[in-house]
Amino acid sequence: MKVSKYIFIKKNIFNLETEKSGEFQLNLLNLDTQALGIPDTDYPTTIKMSSSEFVSLCRDFTNLSDCVKIEVKDEKCTFFVSGKAGNGKYYLKNNNAEKIDDQVIIVNKEDVSCSYGLQYLNSFAKASSLSNIVTLHISSKYPLMIDYEIEDLGFLKFYLAPKMDDDEASNDAEK
């Protein structure tokens, strides 16, 4: 991986009321790898929840384990962690909260159970400052898609392949 000396993004920030300003220049990375295309996918399971709740969930679970198992059955979702320090569960189900930020909407066409690395989820959760809502798109056949809709700007999507158990990895190696 090389850092380009000539290609960069520059951002200036000005606040006229407080007379504060800042300037940032981020060098773009020149990756010497092939681009991995991600096809448009119709995910069978989506979980729409508060992004601050997602951040808290990921942060708390990191103290217990390095991966989280997300299981969705019917319209209920359970996050499981288990490690040397202990174990934990967090339950979500559809609700009709008055505040949109407190609502949980689960759409499930197919029961799903997948494990993901918390190190990566914590990195992706940092985008919660850009949006109050996060949508998790889950499938046993495709990578997890974490979707933040950024008001008036667009969206930010992250993809994360599920973590394979030792049994699954050995079965795949035999094939």
PLM regions: where:
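DNA polymerase processivity clamps
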Residues: M1-S21, Y43-E98, I105-K175
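Conserved loop-to-helix interface motifs that mediate assembly, gating, or partner/ligand docking
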Residues: I13-I38
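Short acidic, glycine/tyrosine-flanked loop/strand segments centered on an H-E-D-like triad
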Residues: L28-D32, N95-D101
